[in-house]
């Protein structure tokens, strides 16, 4: 496989709030690629300049970075400038999916349902506005920092009196706070591989966390969280959710791979989009490898498949 892929950089670590998770993902991917005979090397953008990728003649990179500066389009843009093919979605799709508010707006326009929401600018929002939203939406509410992942910068607010504290917590991470109607129900995720008409959904994973608290600790370090894969739904519902996942994936322009998260409302079994993750975790607790395994693809083979789809999203201008 050395000839097929050349010199491969595995990008992990980085400068986001999700650095710890990225280190775990990257080490797993690196070991998997090495086990397949691929000339793979670790590369931490927090410690080295991206220009070194070109100087050291890397042929392609596997992005195992999470959060800002890794899956928000900025890294993808730099790699486009360097002319180095990379895994996962391109500049535009990465930037859209990193913003939960824009993702919701785009997916709604393509018929993918999402919980009722609004976006508030931190500097312009008053206490009175928070109370008005609480009255309009009803309680409880989910408040989120739109550009963070791994459950960072999220607050569940049970009462109107708790709005300010929840808002302030999210404001530590972002200039905008997403306010979302709370949906009581089951949490699902659907990995998607491929591009366009060839995009395909993998088996659905249902996440059952203790007391429904799927936070950072339970997501990456706890053995108490249960995962059901394939999720126990009938064939018709499974097909519907997988189709919604592919629709959301294509709506924002994803290519390569991504993970689409949903909530299924308890009262009527209706699915709602939560977010799209364009650089999903690849740790021992991660959901994409879990789903792929059920579909018959081992972790090492999944890493190779993702790497094989690495590409540049922008065609260079041909000057005459």
Curated annotation (Swiss-Prot):
ATP binds at residues 134-189. Pathway: Cell wall biogenesis; peptidoglycan biosynthesis. Its cofactor is Mg(2+); Mn(2+). Keywords: ATP-binding, Cell shape, Cell wall biogenesis/degradation, Cytoplasm, Ligase, Magnesium, Manganese, Metal-binding, Nucleotide-binding, Peptidoglycan synthesis. The keyword Repeat does not apply. GO terms for biological process: cell wall organization; peptidoglycan biosynthetic process; regulation of cell shape. Belongs to the D-alanine--D-alanine ligase family. Cell wall formation. InterPro entries: ATP-grasp, ATP_grasp_subdomain_1, D-Ala_lig_Van_CS, D_ala_D_ala, Dala_Dala_lig_C, Dala_Dala_lig_N, PreATP-grasp_dom_sf. SUPFAM superfamilies: Glutathione synthetase ATP-binding domain-like, PreATP-grasp domain. The keyword Magnesium applies. It catalyses: 2 D-alanine + ATP = D-alanyl-D-alanine + ADP + phosphate + H(+). Its EC number is 6.3.2.4. Mg(2+) 2 binds at residues 275, 277. Binds 2 magnesium or manganese ions per subunit. It comes from the Bacteria. Mg(2+) 1 binds at residues 261, 275. This is D-alanine--D-alanine ligase. It is found in: Cytoplasm.
């Amino acid at each position: 496989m050395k000839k097929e892929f050349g010199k491969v950089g595995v990008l992990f670590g980085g400068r986001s709030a999700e650095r710890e998770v990225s280190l775990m993902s990257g080490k797993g991917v690196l070991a998997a690629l090495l086990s397949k005979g691929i000339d793979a090397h670790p590369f931490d953008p927090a410690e080295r300049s991206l220009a070194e990728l070109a100087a050291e003649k890397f042929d392609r990179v596997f992005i195992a970075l999470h959060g800002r500066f890794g899956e928000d389009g900025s890294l993808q843009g730099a790699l486009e400038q360097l002319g180095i093919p990379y895994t996962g979605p391109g500049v535009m799709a990465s930037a859209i999916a990193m913003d939960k508010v824009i993702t919701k707006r785009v997916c709604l326009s393509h018929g993918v349902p999402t919980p009722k929401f609004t976006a508030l600018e931190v500097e312009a929002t008053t206490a009175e506005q928070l109370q008005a939203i609480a009255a309009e939406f009803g309680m409880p509410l989910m408040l989120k920092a739109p550009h963070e992942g791994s459950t960072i910068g999220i607050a569940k607010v049970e009462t109107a009196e708790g709005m300010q504290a929840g808002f302030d917590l999210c404001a530590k991470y972002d200039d905008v706070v997403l306010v979302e109607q709370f949906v009581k129900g089951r949490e699902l995720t659907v990995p998607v591989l491929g591009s366009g008409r060839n995009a395909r959904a993998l088996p659905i994973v249902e996440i059952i966390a203790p007391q429904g608290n799927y936070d950072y600790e339970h997501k990456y370090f706890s053995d108490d969280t249960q995962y059901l894969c394939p999720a126990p739904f009938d064939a018709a519902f499974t097909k519907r959710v997988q189709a919604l996942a592919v629709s959301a994936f294509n709506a924002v322009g994803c290519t390569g791979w991504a993970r689409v998260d949903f909530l299924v409302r308890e009262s009527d079994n209706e699915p709602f989009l939560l977010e799209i993750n364009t650089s999903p975790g690849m740790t021992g607790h991660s959901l994409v490898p879990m789903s792929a395994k059920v579909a018959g693809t081992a972790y090492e083979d999944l890493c190779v498949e993702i790497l094989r789809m690495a590409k540049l999203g922008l065609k260079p201008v041909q000057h005459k």
